[in-house]
């Protein structure tokens, strides 16, 4: 008989109509006060052949009635034993509770399944929870009636503040409103911080509802300056998040959309906000838009953001070129230079000059050089004019890293000097040429060519130095005699005098 009962309980999904109450009782498929009980699928049962219940709901009801036989049956039908505890709590069936309680390691796992506030509270009592834990969980699981029931115990402003913030974080709006309207709070403004952090529009509206209902004692809504300051702060935070609809809601109550507010939209590339307030609402003057453009440059704004701001200025930036160059030099982002160059506004030379003035290593400007395909001769000449010998050396070390390349570098420098007019710049490069000459080996002809080069550019010190190395070379004096004519024609008296001195020696 036991095996027949077991088979029927587990596998009989359709009860024959001929089964009367007695047979059902024998098979264990009869529920007192309810009628026949049969399993119709894995998660549902049929009661009295016409009522469909989920297995867990039936389990809860059976447990609340203390019907252990039906409870066992439903558990064998894959019912969740959590509902045994819930139902037993509802019906005060403590024998069942003690029997199944040991299977629950953490009572929190059943709280989300409890719908009844009294049962919710009984569960906390069963597990010896504190009142503080009860009210915290009441917020988490949206049991407002529990907070209302224990209203007289919620007197500490600090604790209430924590509960209020928890309700905001959990997005339990009814509880937020009740706490805000009913309990004393330390800092109710936190609702705005949470609303903006979570981008919760409902919470923002609720915050303004509490604010203008005078439920925030720390804020005097009748003090226009304080109120404007608060609302403008909200606008700034909303702009940071890119929440245009938050800003529109805030503006219904006041606040100012100013440079500080829109600079946040610039910093985080929220172009919809910029377009709405600059183009559609016309909130800013041209001067203010120029300030925003400089902020965008300093913050490394995206191409789209920079283009948007430039479009408001019709790409007319002649009156602020100096400021643009300064911003790029100080902050190192040259996206704006790329954009303006495409619009036929070329600031490459100005920025390169600024980089050379402000930085002392080649690596700072290497990316810039590659981006704009700047010719090596141009960089070297500009660095020489500014006496930035270290940058010139770093540049050549990057392009020509091997010692065997020094001869090539020497020839490049000579060619640059030949096309250069800046006197001090030429002297810097000639000094570098002579240092390279001291390191490498030159053939006689190459040395004579270098002598002529020094004479052509009136490099008297280097000329005297190389003459000491060439003095005993064959053909040097006849060569020097030829060079004398060059020095005379060029009117280089110091060179002429030193050549004559060299020619006097036998």
From Swiss-Prot:
Pfam families: DUF249. InterPro entries: Ankyrin_rpt-contain_sf, MGF_505. It comes from the Viruses. Disulfide bonds: none annotated. Belongs to the asfivirus MGF 505 family. Plays a role in virus cell tropism, and may be required for efficient virus replication in macrophages. This is Protein MGF 505-4R. It comes from African swine fever virus (isolate Pig/Kenya/KEN-50/1950) (ASFV).
């Amino acid at each position: 008989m036991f095996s027949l009962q077991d088979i029927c309980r587990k596998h009989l999904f359709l009860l024959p109509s001929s089964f009367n109450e007695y047979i059902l009782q024998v098979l264990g498929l009869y529920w007192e006060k309810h009628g026949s009980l049969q399993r119709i699928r894995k998660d549902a049962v049929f009661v009295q052949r016409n009522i469909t219940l989920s297995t867990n709901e039936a389990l809860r009801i059976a447990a609340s009635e203390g019907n252990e036989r039906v409870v066992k049956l439903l558990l064998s039908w894959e019912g969740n034993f959590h509902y045994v505890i819930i139902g037993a709590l509802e019906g005060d069936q403590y024998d069942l509770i003690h029997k199944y309680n040991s299977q629950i390691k953490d009572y929190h796992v059943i709280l989300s399944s409890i719908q009844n506030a009294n049962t919710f509270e009984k569960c906390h009592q069963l597990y010896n929870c504190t009142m503080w834990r009860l009210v915290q969980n009441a917020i988490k699981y949206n049991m407002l009636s529990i907070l209302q029931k224990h209203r007289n115990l919620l007197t500490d402003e600090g604790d209430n503040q924590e509960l209020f913030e928890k309700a905001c974080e959990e997005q339990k709006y009814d509880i937020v409103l009740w706490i805000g309207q009913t309990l004393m709070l330390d800092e109710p403004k936190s609702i705005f911080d949470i609303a903006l952090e979570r981008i919760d529009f409902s919470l923002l509206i609720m915050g303004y509802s509490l604010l203008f209902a005078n439920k925030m004692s720390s804020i005097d809504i009748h003090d226009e300056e304080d109120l404007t300051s608060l609302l403008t702060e909200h606008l700034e935070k909303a702009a940071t998040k890119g929440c245009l609809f938050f800003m529109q809601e805030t503006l219904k109550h006041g606040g100012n959309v100013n440079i500080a507010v829109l600079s946040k939209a610039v910093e985080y590339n929220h172009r919809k906000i910029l377009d709405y307030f600059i183009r559609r609402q016309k909130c800013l003057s041209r001067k203010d838009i120029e300030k925003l453009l400089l902020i965008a440059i300093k913050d490394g704004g995206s191409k789209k953001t920079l283009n948007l701001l430039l479009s408001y200025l019709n790409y007319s930036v002649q009156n602020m070129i100096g400021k643009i160059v300064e911003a790029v030099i100080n902050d190192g982002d040259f996206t704006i230079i790329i954009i303006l160059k495409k619009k036929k506004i070329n600031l490459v030379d100005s920025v390169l000059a600024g980089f050379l003035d402000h930085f002392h290593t080649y690596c700072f400007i290497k990316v810039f050089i590659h981006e704009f395909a700047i010719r090596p001769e141009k960089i070297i000449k500009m660095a020489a004019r500014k006496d930035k010998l270290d940058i010139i050396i770093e540049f050549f070390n990057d392009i020509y890293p091997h010692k065997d390349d020094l001869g090539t570098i020497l020839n490049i420098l000579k060619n640059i000097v030949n096309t250069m007019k800046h006197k001090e710049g030429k002297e810097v490069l000639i000094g570098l040429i002579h240092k390279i000459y001291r390191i490498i080996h030159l053939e006689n002809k190459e040395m004579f060519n270098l002598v002529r080069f020094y004479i052509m550019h009136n490099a008297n010190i280097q000329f005297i130095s190389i003459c000491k190395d060439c003095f005993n070379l064959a053909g040097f004096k006849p060569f020097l005699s030829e060079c004398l004519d060059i020095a005379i024609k060029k009117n280089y008296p110091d060179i002429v005098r030193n050549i004559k001195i060299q020619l006097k020696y036998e």
